[in-house]
Amino acid sequence: MRGDRGGGRVSVVYSQHPDALPELAERLSGLTVHDPGGPAQCLVRTGQLLVPRARVEDAARILRRWVDTVETDGPGLLRLRPPVAADCVRIAADVAERVPVAANHVHLVGTPVLHGTGAVPTPADPPPPPPREVWAPPVTVTLFDTGLDPHPWFADRPWFDPTTAELLDEDADGRADRQAGHGTFVAGVLLRHAPGVTIRAHRVLTPRGLTDDRTLAAALHHESTRPHPHVIVLTAGCHTADDRCPPVLADELARFPTTAVVAAAGNTGTTRPFWPAALPGVVAVGASALDGSPAPFTNRGPWVDRHAPGVDVLSSHVRLAGGVRTFGAARWSGTSFAAPRVAAEIARARLTPPPPPAPRARAHPGP
């Protein structure tokens, strides 16, 4: 999919690139594509196996012939010996009935070279800023994304934490990376439709739009030690070889029994489960096009619970030019931007008494 300027909107054209994951694995070290081009294709960290915290000793014992080192500062990480590192998915499958172990899957958002979502955010005229509502008692939404920059929409709100600022140029080439500003954009969608929420931001995604099971699981575990939020928003995810959720993610999400977990359904245009969105109890959100039909890139299947606008979405954004950050607005497409729309709806329902409907910005129409 690509984004083109045209009348202030993004023209969305969907296309899949079957060689995209192998190409990514060639460009970035430490990645392996399992079953490239096949029905079990998934992207993993080479030679890494993960196991829930309570089963680390069992996994290390069962897998001792293949394991080089074991790390326990977070979800259990078993590093395989180099000769078998590329076989991590197969090795995990061989013992999966005995211990809940799986490869460390790489999670993705957005990049069109990979999976056909809005190529890059397109600069747009900003809509009116969200109202400065104060909800009492507070309704908290925790966002796991690229971080949150001090955009004028939320920089002076009492909940804003400057330590969560986005890293915009990870490769230090002087240009913002392809998914830079993703978290700031998602937070803007949330505030446009639930302007009184309190946002907690966790920076788990790189500005290239990548994270993995272990990084997300560690962040979820940290969040579970705090007063639990009303809503969690997850904007990235992964496919797995066996189409089952990575055990460490299921284990950590089970720590939030009273929290509504909302997750992007993914942009791979498939019916394969996308994790953690496809977990029972998680609200999986697909993207709808401007006419209300499912967007061509959105994942489909009985595990997708809701659809929300995910094409030409208008929200807050941060850009990088000459090393200087500038704040404004952009249009972008993807299920990542449908998920916060549903999260906002849930957050508004958690407020007692419920607030009046959010006003529509007539001068700047758009999702």
Language-model regions, residue ranges each:
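Extracellular S/T/G-rich loop segment that most often corresponds to the catalytic His/Ser-adjacent loop
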Residues: 147, 274-351
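Protease zymogen maturation seam
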Residues: 71-82, 86-140, 146-148, 152-155
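Active-site core segment of subtilase-fold serine proteases
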Residues: 121-198, 218, 222, 226-227, ...
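Substrate-binding/access-modulating region of protease and related hydrolase catalytic domains
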Residues: 2, 205-279, 294, 326-339, ...
